[in-house]
């Protein structure tokens, strides 16, 4: 399915986020040079901004904004470098997702289809929203002054579009996990109904040892796909979370400063255009990661319920394979993680919100000194 999107996704290559072409060696070389230019351009912007510091009378605190600005530059460098290093791995990931879809269709008779329209609407709305919300900051930067805004505009666009790309991949992974879970639920229902099972018109096939083995192999391939995704995007996800957290926290603080009339109200346009998209980024991505983990837990629960069925105990080979499958699901959790530093789920969302409150309290105490 990801292959079918590439004619559209390849335009993300203009920001250095995806490879432009799979087979053309010249295109690969040109894009690597282009990506290197993007990295150098960000570094030059950083050097110029630090070497020629702006007036201390401007809206934002110099120290805080340098920290956020550096975080953006580092994050963009990590994102682009990861794409350069994993140029061929990206298309390998696309092929693996395609092969998994074919296996689900051929061996498990699952209609893979496309994502739900709600997923497309969510991704498109977020993508358009991320671009539109840059406009208020541009307006404030033109009419007043925003420290380091113009130097970090390219970084903002790259980070936001990278999030859209990663979100699309996570939605596709979650789609395949849910399909596998539904098929396991069908197997469980067929065992429970016995001879009365009418699913697919063939109860013997759903309850067979070969079908369970195909399910087990599909789950293992799906876990490998998750692992490959984490290798491809792990560092960029980690960097993006750091930027989103720092951006949203600092801009919520400056919003509070504007509301208590420390600064002019026109700066609300800029602060809202940063922390609102950042918060939605964190919320949506954590929810998508949570969905994948819940589907993985559901798969485990279906298998454990199946192991309790009386007919399973009479078939030694089927029971042994089922026990192996249960252990495989427990040990190989289908989760989105950033190089082992964190798993993307609701617990991460709660930790981020708690950390935001803590840092906001600290910032407000410093501002009152």
UniProtKB/Swiss-Prot annotation:
Short name of one Pfam family: 7tm_7
Q: Which GO terms describe its cellular component?
A: axon; dendrite; membrane; neuronal cell body; plasma membrane
One MF annotation (Gene Ontology) recorded for this entry = ligand-gated monoatomic ion channel activity
Its keywords, alphabetically, are: Cell membrane, Membrane, Receptor, Transducer, Transmembrane, Transmembrane helix
- Per the UniProt record, which residue ranges are transmembrane? 33-53, 60-80, 123-143, 148-168, 225-245, 266-286, 349-368
What tissues harbor this protein? Expressed in the adult labellar chemosensory neurons and in abdominal ganglions. In larvae, is expressed in neurons of the dorsal and posterior pharyngeal sense organs.
| Any single biological process term in GO | chemosensory behavior
- Topology feature Cytoplasmic, residues: 1-32, 81-122, 169-224, 287-348
Which regions of this chain are Extracellular-facing, per the record's topological domains? 54-59, 144-147, 246-265, 369
Entry-linked InterPro entries: 7TM_chemorcpt
Where in the cell does this protein reside? Cell membrane
Protein's membrane topology: Multi-pass membrane protein
Purpose of the protein:
Probable gustatory receptor which mediates acceptance or avoidance behavior, depending on its substrates. Has also atypical sensory function in organ not limited to conventional taste sensing like abdominal ganglions.
Give the family from UniProt.
Answer: Belongs to the insect chemoreceptor superfamily. Gustatory receptor (GR) family. Gr2a subfamily.
- The protein's name is Putative gustatory receptor 39b
Q: What is the source species?
A: Drosophila melanogaster
Gene symbol here is: Gr39b
């Amino acid at each position: 399915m990801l292959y079918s999107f590439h004619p559209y996704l390849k335009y993300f290559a203009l920001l250095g986020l995806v490879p432009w072409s799979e087979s053309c060696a010249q295109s690969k070389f040109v894009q690597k040079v282009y990506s290197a230019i993007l990295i150098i351009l960000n570094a030059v912007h950083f050097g110029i901004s630090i070497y020629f510091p702006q007036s201390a009378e401007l809206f934002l605190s110099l120290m805080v904004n340098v920290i956020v600005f550096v975080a953006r530059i580092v994050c963009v460098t990590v994102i682009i470098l990861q794409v350069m290093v994993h140029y061929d791995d990206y298309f390998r990931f696309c092929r693996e997702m395609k092969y998994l879809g074919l296996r689900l269709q051929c061996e498990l008779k699952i209609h893979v289809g496309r994502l739900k329209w709600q997923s497309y609407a969510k991704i498109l709305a977020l993508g358009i929203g991320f671009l539109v919300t840059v406009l208020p900051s541009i307006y404030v930067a033109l009419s007043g002054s925003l420290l380091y805004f113009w130097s970090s505009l390219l970084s903002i666009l790259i980070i936001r579009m990278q999030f859209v790309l990663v979100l699309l991949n996570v939605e596709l992974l979650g789609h395949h996990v849910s399909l596998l879970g539904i098929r396991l639920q069908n197997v469980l229902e067929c065992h429970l109904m016995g001879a009365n099972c009418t699913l697919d018109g063939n109860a013997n096939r759903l309850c067979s040892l070969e079908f369970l083995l195909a399910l087990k192999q599909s789950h293992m391939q799906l876990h490998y796909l998750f692992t490959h995704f984490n290798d491809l995007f792990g560092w960029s996800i980690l960097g993006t979370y750091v930027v989103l957290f720092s951006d949203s926290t600092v801009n919520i603080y400056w919003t509070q400063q504007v509301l208590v009339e420390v600064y002019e109200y026109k700066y609300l346009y800029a602060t809202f255009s940063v922390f609102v998209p950042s918060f939605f980024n964190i919320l949506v991505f954590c929810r998508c990661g949570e969905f994948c983990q819940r589907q993985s837990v559901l798969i485990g629960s279906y298998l454990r319920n199946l192991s309790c069925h009386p007919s399973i105990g009479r078939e030694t080979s089927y029971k042994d394979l089922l026990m192996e499958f249960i252990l495989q699901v427990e040990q190989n959790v289908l989760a989105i993680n950033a190089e082992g530093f964190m798993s993307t789920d609701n617990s991460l969302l709660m930790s981020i919100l708690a950390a935001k409150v803590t840092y906001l309290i600290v910032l407000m105490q410093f501002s009152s000194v």
